[in-house]
Amino acid sequence: MTKKLFYFVIAAALICSASVFTSCTSDNDDNPATPDLNLSEKIIGKWMVAERDGEPALTNQKTVVTFLSATKGFVSLSRADYDNHRWLNGNECDVKIEGNIVTQICHPQEGVTVTVEMNIKSINEKEMLADRKLTQTIDGKDIVTNVYMQKFVRVTADYSAAILGTWEGHVTSEQDTYGDGLLHRWQYNADGTYVYYVKDGNNWVPYATNTLNEYFVDGNLLCTRWIDNGVENREWWEITIADGKMNWTALRQKEDGTTYTATFEMTKVN
């Protein structure tokens, strides 16, 4: 073989090799492999919704999800919008993980199944991003299907025990239900009930027209509900407790669609 022919053969081989690698790269670009996020380990723990479709989630839209294992979990939420009334304090759910798809199957009440399918896009120690599809089945018929993107943040605090006792405080934001400039008092009991007090002269007395008076704390989410003059009311707060002080904050929406942040500050008195 002459030197000229030898170089021609080598050049042709290199061109063919380049074509092969280019073809492979192109195929991979068209069909990228889904990265293994190791969800069975990384997802374990407590998570709370922080954003919904790229917007900050209102506090009344927040859900706390706890993954105990790759097969079992719990959900806590309070919903009272439209016809969707739910009061779930640690509702047990079955969990299934297949690749980067996490499915939760919950039974909030007899005849009702809620299936939540989460396509996890990313996850680290602090945050998780997922396309979330929720289907509600009532007596075997799919009634509601919602699809949206959600961002979750990991919750490490648990104030369910720290909140027990009596707290007195006042609103610290400009717009709020309790924006009357007065002190307010709540007594949180271990059985999931609470007592709301009002000032009568120099004495604190239970608010007479309130009934039901239930609450739960999951992580740092405080949910309450009560009946006043036959009408059920609910509230949602994110809380912190330290050194005998409790702070509440909530992102809320006004009737015109604008949002504001309500805050409350309390001191433990008993």
How does the language model describe each region?
Residues 49, 67, 94, 117-122, ...:
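A structural signal for short, hydrophobic beta-strand segments that form beta-sheets
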Residues 7-14:
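Sec-dependent N-terminal signal peptides
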Residues 134-166, 210-215, 250-270:
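Edge beta-strand at a domain terminus
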Residues 39-58, 152, 156-179, 212-214:
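Tryptophan-anchored aromatic micro-motifs
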Residues 2-5, 17-45, 148-157, 263-270:
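Bacterial Sec-dependent N-terminal signal peptides
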